[in-house]
UniProtKB/Swiss-Prot annotation:
It holds the Pfam family Myb_DNA-binding. Its main location: nucleus. It is found in: Nucleus. It comes from Arabidopsis thaliana. This is Transcription factor MYB32. Keywords: DNA-binding, Nucleus, Repeat, Transcription, Transcription regulation. Residues 37-61, 89-112 bind DNA. InterPro entries: Homeodomain-like_sf, Myb_dom, Myb_TF_plants, SANT/Myb. SUPFAM superfamilies: Homeodomain-like. SMART domains: SANT (SM00717). Mostly expressed in roots, and, to a lower extent, in stems, flower buds, and siliques. Residues 9-61, 62-116 form the HTH myb-type domain.
Length: 274
């Protein structure tokens, strides 16, 4: 259950206070003291809310209120207290006798804040404005340019280039695409002779002559050039007039697929069975 209302809303006055109401409130508090603000309006014969009576007394009618402008000492004290307490105006008002929290807040927003800005001081942090900007920039750069953090990218990167002129400093930011150098990996798997032998064979076919060597010459037993034996496969023929089967080509052309040319291994496919 909540608290019961301090007064009936139907029979309470709202709006500006009259002089008669001020006199009743002042005379009652002088005679009986502040007491309980909930029961004070009925005792004083006022058709007002207890909160309205309290604010009227504290902000306008109490005898120790200071009237007039704030002094320089009060300005300095408000600035020091605001740097320590922030926007806690009720606590600041306790340090300034005769001043209310509402009065101090209004004076801060209308005078003191503008005074600090003219001096180049940030009213929120009470530091120089340039220092706060540089600290924010350094904090942002430290967050983005952390040496322990490395950014991995698989696409084109953008590099910022700043060009400065001699006569006048002109900063121009251009973005140039930096192409990444990746290894050209061929992951295709196939069984075929080396590409050097293919180029050599295509070059020989292009000039119209193909040289065939026997197995002895291919394994190093021959002279390594044109064979002097009477084997048909070792003769030099024109590619246009020669007709040979696929088995002759595979057995006669010197492909070094498994590196057998450097080893002394006999070609059992050319041996005749007796």
């Amino acid at each position: 259950m909540g608290r019961s209302p301090c007064c009936e809303k139907d029979h309470t006055n709202k709006g500006a206070w009259t002089k008669e109401e001020d006199d009743k409130l002042i005379s009652y508090i002088k005679a009986h003291g502040e007491g309980c603000w909930r029961s004070l309006p009925r005792s004083a014969g006022l058709q007002r809310c207890g909160k309205s009576c309290r604010l009227r007394w504290i902000n306008y009618l109490r005898p120790d209120l200071k009237r007039g402008n704030f002094t320089l000492e009060e300005d300095d004290l408000i600035i020091k207290l605001h740097s320590l307490l922030g926007n806690k105006w009720s606590l600041i008002a306790t340090r300034l006798p005769g001043r209310t929290d509402n009065e101090i807040k209004n004076y801060w927003n209308t005078h003191v804040k503008r005074k600090l800005l003219r001096k180049g001081i940030d009213p929120a942090t009470h530091r120089p404005i340039n220092e706060t900007k540089t600290s924010q920039d350094s904090s942002d750069s430290s967050k983005t340019e952390d040496p322990l953090v490395k950014i991995l990218s698989f696409g084109p990167q953008l590099e910022k280039i700043a060009n400065f002129g001699d006569e006048r400093i002109q900063k121009r930011v251009e973005y140039s695409v930096v192409e990444e150098r990746c290894l050209d990996l061929n992951l295709e798997l196939r069984i075929s002779p080396p590409w050097q032998d293919k180029l050599h064979d295509e070059r020989n076919l292009r000039f119209g002559r193909v040289k065939y060597r026997c197995s002895a010459c291919r394994f190093g037993f021959g002279n390594g050039k044109e064979c002097s034996c009477n084997n048909v496969k070792c003769q030099t023929e024109d590619s246009s007039s020669s007709s040979y089967s696929s088995t002759d080509i595979s057995s006669s052309i010197g492909y070094d697929f498994l590196g057998l040319n450097n080893t002394r291994v006999l070609d059992f496919s050319t041996l005749e069975m007796k």
